[in-house]
């Protein structure tokens, strides 16, 4: 079983990693090709392309200039320790043991606009390049065209290392990022957990809570060494509970009702 997550815009390179083990991303050459194109953009063009502030544009202009195809602890940090958004607040990798991270290395993947597909301990140099960015490149008009079938093929290769009964992809990524996966070419069923909160008289997805819950779900799977999707139904972190009536074979709905 593999769980896929979205990356985070916010990054933490200040906190020292609590583990030394690291790996190198599989798609460094592809990332270098994208960096080459990004380096041709001015800060103003970056701001326009990504719809970000001038300050952020200048920061990323500098990041692209400093990016190197040679990865080391001097210029990079393990992906799940560097990402610092809502999902990673839930996953909370800095409190996972070395054994937990070793398990995650084989069962968790992070989709990335620049790096394609990352393992948790893959070294990550700071960047910003969301998957939905319409960045024209030699392979097409956007990053979905750039990555094509590569991400799906890499997922298939990893899934084949699992026992047949455990060959399932659990989609804990956003729609923007999961669009980079080709379901028709994926050699495994897909299960998507959905997290809903009671608000305004009905259950609905609240973005901040749903993102955090995706990270909590990934952590739950890692800590409990879950390898079959049925086991995910026991997830109960932060007050969520599986709702069988609202779920089906491909969508697992978890709901919680907090007093308003």
From Swiss-Prot:
Q: Which Pfam families match?
A: H2O2_YaaD
Its Gene Ontology biological processes? response to hydroperoxide
Kindly state one GO CC term assigned in the UniProt record. cytosol
InterPro entries on file: YaaA
Question: What domain of life does the native source organism fall in?
Answer: Bacteria
The family note in this entry says: Belongs to the UPF0246 family.
NCBIfam families hit by this protein: PRK02101.1-1, PRK02101.1-3
Name the UniProt record assigns to this protein: UPF0246 protein Bphyt_1375
User: Which lineage ranks, top first, belong to the organism behind this chain?
Assistant: Bacteria, Pseudomonadati, Pseudomonadota, Betaproteobacteria, Burkholderiales
């Amino acid at each position: 079983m593999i769980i896929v997550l979205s990356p985070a815009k916010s990054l933490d390179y200040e906190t020292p990693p609590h583990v030394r083990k690291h790996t190198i991303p599989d798609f460094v050459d592809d990332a270098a090709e994208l960096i080459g194109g990004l380096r041709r953009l001015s800060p103003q063009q970056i701001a326009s392309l990504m719809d970000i502030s001038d300050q952020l544009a200048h920061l990323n202009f500098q990041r692209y200039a400093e990016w190197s195809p040679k990865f080391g602890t001097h210029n990079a940090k393990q992906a799940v320790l560097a990402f610092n958004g809502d999902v990673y607040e839930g996953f909370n990798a800095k409190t996972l043991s070395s054994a937990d991270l070793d398990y995650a290395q084989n069962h968790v993947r992070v989709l990335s606009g620049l790096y394609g597909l990352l393992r948790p301990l893959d070294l990550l140099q700071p960047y910003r390049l969301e998957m939905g960015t319409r960045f024209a490149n030699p392979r097409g008009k956007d990053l979905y065209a750039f990555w094509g079938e590569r991400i799906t093929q890499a997922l298939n290769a990893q899934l084949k290392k699992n026992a047949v009964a455990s060959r399932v992809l659990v989609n804990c990524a956003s729609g923007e990022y999961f669009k980079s996966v080709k379901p028709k070419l994926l050699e495994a069923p897909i299960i998507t957990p959905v997290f809903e909160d009671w608000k305004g008289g009905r259950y609905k997805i609240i973005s901040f809570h749903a993102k955090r819950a995706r990270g909590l779900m990934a952590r739950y799977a890692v800590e409990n060494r879950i390898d079959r999707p049925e086991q995910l139904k026991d997830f109960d972190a932060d007050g969520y509970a599986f709702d069988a009536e609202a779920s089906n074979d491909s969508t697992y709905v978890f709901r919680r009702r907090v007093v308003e």
